[in-house]
Amino acid sequence: MAKVIYNVTLSVSEEVHEPWLAWMKGSHIPDVLGTGCFEWAKLLRVHAFEQGGLTYAVMYCAATMEDYERYVSAHSGRLQAEHEALYKDTVVAFRTMLEVLHEFSPKIN
């Protein structure tokens, strides 16, 4: 079974950057992982030449498509609504689901 990466890219305005980042690390990402639908999450800073904000990506790994679909049907609406209620006009999110076709690692001889 193929793993699934649920990627959320977020453009965050500078005025809410610090409290948003603290909330993501201390509340939102742990809540998403607490659903039991994902094996791990990674928070990344996107380095791009943009004006008026900072860009982040959060990658969540689901072991199966069924786990991802369970997250979408049972949990995503509530968790996205919480984010929207706090950061409606200051954070824009773009979501993508990626199917892992193959994993590579360096060969160690």
Question: What is each residue range found by the language model?
Answer:
Residues 33-35, 63, 103-107:
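A short, structured loop/turn motif at beta-sheet edges
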Residues 61, 78, 92:
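A contiguous, mid-protein "functional segment" used to position or interact
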Residues 4-11, 41-74:
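Short, well-ordered beta-strand segments in beta-rich or mixed alpha/beta enzyme
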Residues 2-4, 38, 108:
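Anionic, Ser/Thr-rich low-complexity intrinsically disordered regions
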Residues 22, 70-79:
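Short amphipathic alpha-helices in soluble, non-transmembrane regions
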Residues 42-52, 82-109:
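Glycine-rich beta-strand-turn "strand-cap" elements at beta-sheet edges
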Residues 16-42, 80-81:
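Short amphipathic alpha-helical segments
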